[in-house]
Structures are given as C-alpha cells and as structure tokens.
Amino acid sequence: MARLAGVDIPREKRLEIALTYIYGVGKTRAHETLAATGISADVRVKDLTDAQLVELRDYIEGNYKVEGDLRREVAADIRRKVEIGSYEGLRHRKGLPVRGQRTKTNARTRKGPKRTVAGKKKAGR
C-alpha cells in the first residue's frame, strides 16, 4: 500500500477514489489535486511511479490541511465555541444537533438511544 499524509491508500482502486481515504480530501479536492499534478484520475494506485507519489504527497501536504492537523483544528474550533458560551457551544455541550435541526422527533444519532420516562398509569375500573 502507498502512504500519503500518513494514510495507507488502497492499491487496487482508481487514484481519484483512493485519495478520498485521506481525512480532508473529498472528490472535489482529489480532482483538483490530480489536475494540478497532471496525473490521470483513471490510473490505479499500484501503477503509480515513485516520482508521482512524491509529487502527490508534496502537493497535498503543501496545499491542504489534512488528517491530524485538520482534526485538531476542528476540535479546537468546537472547544472555543463551548468556552465562549455561544449557542453552538451549548448545543455541543448538551449533545444536541448544532445546525438547527428539529429535536421533537428524530435527532436520535446525536441524542443517543431513547430513555423511557414514566408516564401516567391507566386508571382501573
């Protein structure tokens, strides 16, 4: 397996798809990277030369924040919002959706499994 930005890239996949295994590189960035380096998107990772791998590695690490740096930056942004007490920070702290989604129903991924609350008992006859 080839390593780019500290990630093992799958050898059998097309390069455009394989680059998306790097955190911070989606289809658009993969396409931009290949256009800038002049490498075909249809090439398989196993067919790349060492020079092409070095060129890709230098371009990605030089132009984009990826993997650990990006994860740290995102975590720092969330931490800052929590510390200053913004609305978004409060939502993060409470474990609720941050971007305005409804919570009366749905939002189960963010809220976790249902916790049953005792309700009214049925009146006997």
Swiss-Prot record:
UniProt GO MF annotations: rRNA binding; structural constituent of ribosome; tRNA binding
Region forming the signal peptide: none
Gene3D superfamilies, per database record: 1.10.8.50, 30s ribosomal protein s13, domain 2 (4.10.910.10)
Pfam families cross-referenced by the UniProt entry: Ribosomal_S13
Disulfide bond annotation, renumbered to this chain: none
GO CC, one annotated term: small ribosomal subunit
Keywords: Ribonucleoprotein, Ribosomal protein, RNA-binding, rRNA-binding, tRNA-binding
Coiled coil: none
Disordered: annotated segments: 93-125
Similarity annotation: Belongs to the universal ribosomal protein uS13 family.
Function comment: Located at the top of the head of the 30S subunit, it contacts several helices of the 16S rRNA. In the 70S ribosome it contacts the 23S rRNA (bridge B1a) and protein L5 of the 50S subunit (bridge B1b), connecting the 2 subunits; these bridges are implicated in subunit movement. Contacts the tRNAs in the A and P-sites.
Quaternary structure and interacting proteins, as annotated: Part of the 30S ribosomal subunit. Forms a loose heterodimer with protein S19. Forms two bridges to the 50S subunit in the 70S ribosome.
Name this polypeptide is given: Small ribosomal subunit protein uS13
